[in-house]
C-alpha cells in the first residue's frame, strides 16, 4: 500500500518537473548540456550483468571479473591479452550502436536551439546520434583514439580499423602480436586516449573544442541560458556539475536542470532556479 502511494506521487512529481523543464527549454536562448555516465547508462550502455557476460564471459571465468571496469584495470601480463580485452571493450562501447535512442531523443529537443555539449563520456555517442561535432567538447578523451603510452608527442590516432582487426583475429583471449598497436613516432606501446593520469594527450582538436566551449559561454553569459545536467555524478564534479552550479548562481537569467536517477539535486543557493528530476533520463526526455 505505502509503496504504491509513494510510486504514484513520485510519478506525478516527475511529470510536473518534466513540464517545467519543457517550458524552460522552450524559453531558453541557449542550452548547455553537461553529460555524464548516467546518460549512456540510460541509453543501454551498462557495464555489468547480461551485457558483460555476453562479450566477456571468458575473461570473467578466468579472472573472476564481474563487470567491464574491473577488467579494464587488470594488469595483464602480456599485451596480446591486454588488447584482446580492450579491443572488445572499445568495440562494444564505442563502435556498436546504443541499445536505446536516448541520444537521438536529446538531439530532437535541442537541435533547433543554440546549444553546446560538454561531456565526460568517452563513447562518442553524441556524434553518432547526429550532434554537430563543433558543438561538442569531450573533456576526458575518446575510446576511438589511441595515443602513445609515454607519451612522446601530443598526437592521437583513430583506431577503428585496428580494433576491428583485433576483434576478428583474436583467439584464446589473445590478439596476434603484429596487431599490438605501437606509436608510429617512438615505437612504444600505444594506449587509449583516456584521462587516467598526467599522460593524457590533449591534442589540437581537444584544445579547439575547449576554446569553442569557452567562447560559447562568453557569448551567452547575459542571456537566458539553461544548464542541463544529464547523468553526471561526483567522480569529476568540477568539470560539469560544480561549474554549472556556479554559473547558474552567478548568471541572473540562467537556470539549472538535472535529470539523474538517484542523484538529482541542487544546492540551496540555486534552488529557486533549479529543476531536479529523480528518474531515468530516457524516460523523462520522452515526456518533454
Q: Where are these predicted regions, by residue range?
A:
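Conserved catalytic alpha/beta core of Sir2/sirtuin-type deacylases, generalized to analogous enzyme cores
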Residues: 1-288
Amino acid at each position: 500500500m505505502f509503496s504504491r502511494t509513494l510510486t504514484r506521487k513520485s510519478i506525478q512529481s516527475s511529470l510536473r518537473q518534466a513540464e517545467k523543464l519543457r517550458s524552460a527549454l522552450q524559453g531558453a536562448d541557449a542550452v548547455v548540456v553537461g553529460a555524464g555516465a548516467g546518460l549512456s547508462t540510460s541509453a543501454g550502455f551498462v557495464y555489468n550483468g547480461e551485457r558483460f557476460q555476453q562479450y566477456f564471459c571468458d575473461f570473467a571465468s578466468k579472472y573472476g571479473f564481474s563487470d567491464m571496469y574491473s577488467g579494464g584495470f587488470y594488469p595483464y601480463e602480456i599485451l596480446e591479452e591486454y588488447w584482446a580485452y580492450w579491443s572488445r571493450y572499445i568495440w562494444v562501447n564505442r563502435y556498436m550502436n546504443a541499445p536505446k535512442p536516448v541520444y537521438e531523443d536529446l538531439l530532437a529537443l535541442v537541435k533547433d536551439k543554440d546549444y553546446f555539449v560538454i561531456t565526460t563520456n568517452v563513447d562518442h555517442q553524441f556524434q553518432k546520434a547526429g550532434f554537430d561535432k563543433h558543438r561538442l567538447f569531450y573533456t576526458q578523451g575518446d575510446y576511438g583514439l589511441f595515443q602513445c603510452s609515454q607519451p612522446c608527442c601530443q598526437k592521437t590516432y583513430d583506431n577503428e580499423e585496428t580494433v576491428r582487426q583485433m576483434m576478428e583475429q583474436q583467439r584464446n583471449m589473445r590478439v596476434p602480436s603484429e596487431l599490438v598497436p605501437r606509436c608510429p613516432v617512438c615505437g612504444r606501446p600505444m594506449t587509449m586516449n583516456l584521462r587516467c593520469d598526467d599522460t593524457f594527450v590533449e591534442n589540437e582538436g581537444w584544445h579547439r573544442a575547449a576554446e569553442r566551449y569557452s567562447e560559447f559561454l562568453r557569448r551567452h553569459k547575459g542571456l537566458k541560458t539553461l544548464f542541463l545536467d544529464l547523468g553526471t555524478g561526483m567522480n569529476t564534479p568540477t568539470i560539469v556539475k560544480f561549474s554549472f552550479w556556479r554559473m547558474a548562481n552567478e548568471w541572473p537569467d540562467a537556470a539549472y536542470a538535472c535529470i539523474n536517477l538517484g542523484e538529482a539535486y541542487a544546492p540551496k543557493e540555486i534552488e529557486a532556479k533549479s529543476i531536479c528530476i529523480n528518474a531515468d533520463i530516457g524516460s523523462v526526455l520522452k515526456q518533454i
